[in-house]
Amino acid sequence: MSDTSISAASEAFEQLAEAIRHRRSVYGHISGLRMDRFAPGEAWSTLPYRPVFVGDSDTGVIHGGVVTAMLDESCGMAVQLALDGSRAIATLDLRIDYQKPATPGLDIKAHAVCYRVTRSIAFVRATAYQEEESEPVATATACFMIGANRTNMLTDRPAFTGAPPPLEAPDDPSGPFATSPFARCLGIRLADDDTLVMPFSQQIIGNPVLPAIHGGMTGAFLETSAIITVMRELGVDAPPKPIGLTVNYLRSGRALDTIASASIVKQGRRVVAFEARAWQDDAAKPIATAFGHFMLRPEPGQEHD
């Protein structure tokens, strides 16, 4: 390859990276997530700490869904950096393993690597950390579909114009999410039939062209549904600690309210296995399903070995 060809390829890649940096998901933009460094098939990103990201105000720990959404978007960046920027991508499945709670007040960083691309599928792994990548907060593996639809987030006109509303958590001292600012930020509410509802808003958009709900927001919603189900069915006051979550994405979340339900699959003395599903206008057509495990927190006067 001539020097001219190398220079042209390098310039084209720089332009692709800049497009990815500036034309991302709506949620990614308003959350403050930024791409710090890039290489072919690799992305390094940072999510600045914000009080609205807290999942349990009693401990100050960030909601697991915030980490899920960050890793989902960071993996998407890596996939786009492995491609030419002309094809739409969509998350097929995402597995998160939570290694330790994020330290309150510190930013979260991520390093995502797209390690293999076939004609239709991209395979990615990622690490979320705070100070050192060798001490992860969470790790992830994911599969993305290539050419998932006919949109191009990097060039097509968004469905909504104007600035989206900022991420804010309205006060609700007597509601089920009194101690979860992030759940309140998403507007999640408990319905009369004990399902949970996440109203559609511009804040939770992933693909702004369709528009479609951010896959990470769907994952956060499913995890929240499972947390509420476990607390309610076991009669515990403290939210359980997430161990792992696997989300399977079945169809795009459209510009509609989303409903979720969860159930306990197995309960041990310390660990609970759960499954959850989310749908929109037809419960028989879920947009995503999830399964995972929680660690129960000791009740006052109890100790876990």
Where are the model-predicted features located?
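Terminal targeting signals and extreme-terminal segments of soluble enzymes
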Residues: M1-D305
